[in-house]
Amino acid sequence: MTKQIITLVGRPNVGKSTLFNRLSIRKKAIVHDLPGVTRDRKYTDGKIGSFEFLLIDTPGLDENPNSMGERLIEQTTKAILEADLICFMVDGRSGILPDDKLLSSFVRKYNKPAILVVNKCEKAFDFDKEYYKLGFDSMIAISAEHGTGLIDLYDEIIAKLPEEESIKTNIADPIKGDCLQIVVSGRPNAGKSTFINALINDERLLTGPEAGITRESIEIDWQYKNNHIKLIDTAGLRKKSTITESLEKLSASDTINSIKFANTVILMIDALAPLKQQDLNIASHVVHEGRSIVIVVNKWDLVKESEKEAFQEEFYYQINTHLPQVKGIPVLFISAINKQNIEQVLDACLKIYKIWNKKITTSKLNEWLNFTTEAHLLPLQKGGRRVRVKYMTQTKTRPPTFKLFSNNPEKITDSYTRYLVNNMREAFDMPGVPIRFIYVKTKNPYV
């Protein structure tokens, strides 16, 4: 089957070549010597996850398209016309510049599927209104240099491209033929490396009683029940002693980046160490990144039988109290050193990964929405008009994300959103995964 084509467009110095090399199957992008291709337009075979495509890098355009050199316009125009999808790149550090606005207009007139890719976002990034003014309905923040955000970019690319059979197959069965990336995270000395060694029946990872033996993230390719799995052992996350507990201050940035690229995160808890705020910070970070999560309490064999029931009751209470936004997180109690219940952890990961990839038809969504909103109406506003959520559709998976159309979305309270999300979990059997709602105002506020 002919590969689909993705074209990178943007002004100079926004990181097109860096992303081009990052996505290239080869470590260094090689220009294809194709007939009729000049040296100004570079081609390479690209890959994200299991999806392969042809990638085009275009010359940087930094002037008004009406006065640009004819050759640059010609090269970029040809690359746009060839494309099945355009990644329009801007620099997240410098923000939106006049050239970005001019170029976005130049690109949009071709009516090609497009994603706004905000590069150089090494830290958490919020899109302000200037980015929306560029006119793209899909926006992703990445760091091409560090490789962060590529899973989100992959999701948007799959959502935007025409649904070829090969892509449909990957979405319908997200595990077979794909690589499930499982990050094992937690505080130091919780037993992460011991757990992975027990799974693969091999002393691949150095273990011991000293906290912090693992100094960097280590990847292991593995097969489980005919599924290709990449297990990633991470350095234990601990707070810097001189800083507050805020999530941004967590040390071990390599571990934080591994979580960004994970499909599922196993949060390992030491049964002999009380549940701490740091554990909850890690779990909250996983949820904030939109990843699926499984909580594993290790060293369960060392807890007295007479204390286990009370331990579990208190543990579930703490998780449900501090992580109400993801009700139903799988929690398993294991002994890694004795290989007790360890396969149950992988089974839970496979199950929640499928939920994380769940796609619901628009008709079923709106049938549920009508019933749920009628059962619990939003209050009347001034003038006697009632706020209503009229329609919804699923815009992406990983995590399940939904766009809801309302006559007055700013009046929808957080408590009402929680009501909808919790109801959706039950109705569509979606425990333990982040569910995201995006509210959009309908053009006519009176309907």
Curated annotation (Swiss-Prot):
Record-listed GTP 1 binding positions: 10-17, 57-61, 119-122
Domain KH-like: 358-443
Positions contributing to GTP 2 binding: 186-193, 233-237, 298-301
Record keywords, A-Z: GTP-binding, Nucleotide-binding, Repeat, Ribosome biogenesis
Protein's UniProt keywords contain Signal: no
GO biological process: ribosome biogenesis
GO MF annotation: an example: GTP binding
Superkingdom of this protein's organism: Bacteria
CDD domains documented for this protein: EngA1, EngA2
Domain EngA-type G span(s) in chain numbering: 4-165, 180-357
Name of protein: GTPase Der
Lineage, opening ranks: Bacteria, Pseudomonadati, Pseudomonadota, Alphaproteobacteria, Rickettsiales
Chain's gene name: der
